């Protein structure tokens, strides 16, 4: 699978179109266009191609904001999935509430992790992960069960990762984020550390 790391709106769209069989990572660094807008353009492209099995995973506090912006700026319908709406869907007879017809599913990290099997079975075509730095500890395995559950549930799904702070404390955070997209890009943790620690040392010299 191809992996594109992009920094602006043009690169984002070009990469999204060129890597139809690949996976996409996005860090919205443009000073003029917000990450929600950039992601919205990718979502709109998928929607126009009738690829509508889409999920957005975001902090709980941002779910309504995502829903409003999708409707107001891109005319895209969405469905916020939480404990209450999940139960209501089940009562209506929907065996997997993550499967919504012509609606983008919006849910929280915690809820996606809790229902990771249902997320996987929904077979999403695209996932947008907002504030993706929350998954940067994925490389720690059992120490980050939420990150692992989400990454595993979306293992066959194309991903757009949105974050303004991909790196805070360690280069391993970059390793963790990229591994969410594809476990094989950097190899294992040891090879990553060997390759990039030597690069940092060489640069410093």
Feature map (PLM): residue ranges:
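Conserved pre-motif I regulatory segment
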Residues: 1-29
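Conserved helicase ATPase motor motifs in RecA-like P-loop NTPase domains
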Residues: 31-32, 157-170
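SF2 helicase/translocase NTPase motor core
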Residues: 1-4, 13, 36, 47-146, ...
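A short helix-turn-beta junction within AAA+ P-loop NTPase domains corresponding to the substrate/partner-engaging
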Residues: 174-187
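Hydrophobic residues on the short alpha-helix immediately C-terminal to a glycine-rich phosphate/catalytic loop
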Residues: 42-46, 66, 177
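Conserved AAA+/SF3 P-loop NTPase catalytic/coupling segment centered on the Walker-B
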Residues: 129, 171-174
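Pre-Walker A (Motif I) flank of P-loop NTPase domains
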Residues: 21-29, 52, 103, 157-158
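Walker A/P-loop
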Residues: 22-42
